[in-house]
Each structure stands twice: as structure tokens, then as C-alpha cells.
């Protein structure tokens, strides 16, 4: 990796943001993770509006990362391991466009990397990858009670049965990339 002085931003949507956030909080080189919304038409959307499926927004995480420690490509490899990029507008029992698989890019380089990783990952999956690659739009941070949700509610039903297995898969598969 080339030496760069500033952090970079990655914005990823792979279903419920509680899952994605919990994984990336443990990734070495990721310095900040926030849950939020992007990709729709509503301004200042609320969780209830996004879950209602009328805003067009996806649940996403905004990652700040040090490219000297973890490459954008590595973040995407994690992303494609912790969710199913072949199911359109759903992850498990979470159904709707707000749960779509999407990569919002912040530069032409990120877009090229995302498309390359998708092409490579296509060989891993039996079904076609439906992940969207779109330019980043206005970011809306989710309500405070969604931030660091898994750490605050590890025994809550959804966290125990959906989030925890994804975190365990990350820990097993990417132990060399953990903090």
C-alpha cells in the first residue's frame, strides 16, 4: 500500500446496519463506524420511515479507515463474506429495498475496485451478485440508539441470532484483520 496521510471513507449497505457496523468495529485500520442512511429521496429520514420502505434509502455504514493499515479492497472482501450479495432487496428475514446490497463509492478508484472485486467474487457465489455500485450521495446518520447497537444489546434476540453469527464469521475468517 502506498503511504497516504489521511483517512478515507467507505460506505456499504449489506442488510441491517447493526450487523455491518458490529463487524467493522472490530476491523484493524477502521477508525470510525457510523450507521446511517443513503440512496433515497427523503431528506432527514428517520428509522421508521426507512423501515417503511418509502424513502428509497438503504441502511448503510460509513467507515473511516486508514488505507496504510487496511485497503479498500480488504474492506470489500469482508463485506462480501458477511452478507449474501445474491439476494435482491433482502438479507435473511429482513426484506425491502432498505436492506439491499450496495456500495456507495467516493471516488472513481473506489468504483473501479468495487467492480473488480464483484467480478472476482462472482466465481464464489452460485447465483449472480446483485450488489449495486453507485456514487455516494447525501449521508444521513442514524439515530443515536442505533450506533454501536450490538455492543449495547448483545443478548437482544436479533443480535444474538443474526448479528452474533456474522461477527463470529468475521472473527474466524479474518482473524488477521482484527484489532
Say what each PLM segment does.
Residues 1-179:
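Flexible coil/turn and secondary-structure edge motifs
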Amino acid at each position: 500500500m502506498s503511504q497516504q496521510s489521511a483517512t478515507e471513507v467507505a460506505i456499504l449497505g449489506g442488510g441491517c446496519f447493526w450487523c455491518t457496523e458490529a463487524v467493522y468495529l472490530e476491523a484493524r485500520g477502521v477508525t470510525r463506524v457510523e450507521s446511517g442512511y443513503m440512496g433515497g429521496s427523503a431528506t432527514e429520514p428517520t428509522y421508521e420511515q426507512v423501515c417503511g420502505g418509502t424513502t428509497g434509502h438503504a441502511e448503510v455504514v460509513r467507515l473511516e479507515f486508514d488505507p496504510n493499515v487496511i485497503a479498500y479492497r480488504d474492506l470489500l472482501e469482508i463485506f462480501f463474506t458477511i452478507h449474501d450479495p445474491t439476494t435482491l432487496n433482502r438479507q435473511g428475514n429482513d426484506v425491502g429495498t432498505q436492506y439491499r446490497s450496495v456500495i456507495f463509492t467516493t471516488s472513481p478508484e473506489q468504483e473501479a475496485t468495487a467492480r473488480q472485486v464483484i467480478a472476482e467474487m462472482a466465481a464464489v457465489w452460485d447465483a449472480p451478485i446483485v450488489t449495486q455500485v453507485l456514487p455516494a450521495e447525501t449521508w444521513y446518520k442514524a439515530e443515536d440508539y442505533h450506533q454501536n447497537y450490538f455492543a449495547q444489546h448483545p443478548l437482544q434476540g436479533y443480535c444474538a441470532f443474526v448479528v452474533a453469527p456474522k461477527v463470529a464469521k468475521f472473527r474466524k475468517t479474518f482473524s488477521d484483520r482484527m484489532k
